[in-house]
Structures are given as structure tokens and as C-alpha cells.
Regions:
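Conserved PLP-enzyme active-site core in the AAT-like
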Residues: 1-131, 136
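N-terminal start-of-domain structural block
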Residues: 9, 13-17, 141-147, 188
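Non-catalytic surface loops within mature trypsin-like serine protease
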Residues: 38-40, 165-167, 194
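Conserved small-domain helix->loop->beta segment predominantly found in fold-type I
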Residues: 89-92, 96-98, 107, 113-114, ...
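Conserved small/polar residues in nucleotide/adenosyl-binding loops
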Residues: 188-194
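Glycine-rich phosphate/pyrophosphate-binding loop
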Residues: 197-198
Length: 198
């Protein structure tokens, strides 16, 4: 779960970034949306054994008078997404959802900072708990992921973590006991019903 306030994938070598604006960007999950960010650096003309690896970009599109998207250069992916996926599915964010997402961007940096501070406290607590065998969180000293955070020069590691419950990994009793004791929470004004199904 990353945002541009946490990490900038294009600067780290990614060619295309797909993100959800529903999660961190809105700040409250009140809008549904997403984005595709094209760095414009990917070579869509690559061939293997004389065949195009990406035929949707290199073969003529009859819907657009034989246009070959790869011939357009840097904007090839973004234009293919608009001219194909968006045209065929209508997957455009509504004006209201766009407005709600924009409201959340004002406080994004502050929220990311707080999310990370809270996640680190939870990870540190779990790391010392006798019923936890292992915590997977790059913000912990000694984490095998810490070196990656430092190599990338990231101030934060994100607010998502996982952990393994202590005990025999083949005996799932402790895991089911933990799962059965969980109570779903909501971080918005919304409430969850008493009985939730996954």
C-alpha cells in the first residue's frame, strides 16, 4: 500500500504504476477510484524469435484506422489504455469520487507519517510478544527488509505488516484461536455488522 508520499516507483525504475485512490489517497475510503501512471519509458516493440511480445501495441488496431500504438512512442501505454480499456469498459472515475479523492490529498503526507509511526509501534509491540514468532516489517531493526528500505533511501516503510503466531506451524489451533478472537474495526464513520463474512 504505497502512495507518492511514501515511495516514487517511477524514480526507482518502474515503467508503469497502478494504484488505488480508494485507500490512502482519500483518507477515509469514501470514494472508489484508481490511477495508472505511465512513465513513458517502456519499449513496446520488443520481439522474441521474430514475434512481437506485445502484439496489442505493434499490430494495427482496426478500431483506429490501423493505428499501431508502439509507433506513438512514450505515450503508447496511456493512449492504448484510454482508447481500448476506457472506451470498452467505461472505467472512468465519477466527478464526485474524483472530488472526494482530491479532498484527501491535502492531508496525505501527514496521514502517511502517522500511519507509519503507528505501524512501527504495533510492529515493535508484536516483536516482543511471547505469542508472536516473527514480525515482517521493514521498519524494525534486524528486519531482512531494512536493507532495502535504506538502499532505496525511503524515509518510511509503509503501514502494512504481517506476523507469524508462535507455536507449531503444522498445528493451526493457535492461528484459528487468534482469527476467531478478531473483531473487525472501521476507521471511518461506517460501522460493520456484528456478523461479517469474508
Amino acid at each position: 500500500m504505497a502512495t507518492a508520499a511514501l515511495v516514487r516507483p517511477l524514480e526507482l525504475g518502474a515503467d508503469i504504476v497502478v494504484l488505488s485512490t480508494t485507500k490512502f489517497y482519500t483518507g477515509n475510503g469514501a470514494a472508489i477510484g484508481g490511477a495508472i501512471v505511465d512513465g513513458g519509458s517502456f519499449d513496446w516493440t520488443v520481439e522474441r524469435d521474430g514475434e512481437s511480445v506485445f502484439p496489442l501495441f505493434t499490430t494495427p488496431d482496426p478500431a483506429y484506422h490501423g493505428l499501431k500504438y508502439a509507433d506513438l512512442g512514450a505515450p503508447a501505454f496511456a493512449l492504448r489504455a484510454r482508447a481500448g480499456l476506457l472506451r470498452d469498459t467505461g472505467a472512468a472515475i465519477s466527478p464526485f469520487n474524483a472530488w472526494v479523492a482530491l479532498q484527501g490529498i491535502d492531508t496525505l503526507a501527514l496521514r502517511v507519517e502517522k500511519h507509519n509511526a503507528n505501524a512501527k509501534k504495533v510492529a515493535e509491540f508484536l516483536a516482543t510478544h511471547d505469542k508472536v514468532a516473527k514480525v515482517n516489517y521493514a521498519g524494525l531493526e534486524g528486519s531482512p527488509y531494512k536493507a532495502t528500505q535504506e538502499k532505496l533511501g525511503l524515509k518510511y516503510t509503509g503501514s502494512v505488516l504481517s506476523f507469524d503466531i508462535a507455536g507449531d506451524q503444522d498445528d493451526k489451533t493457535a492461528a484459528w484461536k487468534f482469527i476467531d478472537a478478531l473483531k473487525p474495526v472501521s476507521y471511518t464513520h461506517l460501522t460493520l455488522p456484528t456478523i461479517c463474512s469474508v
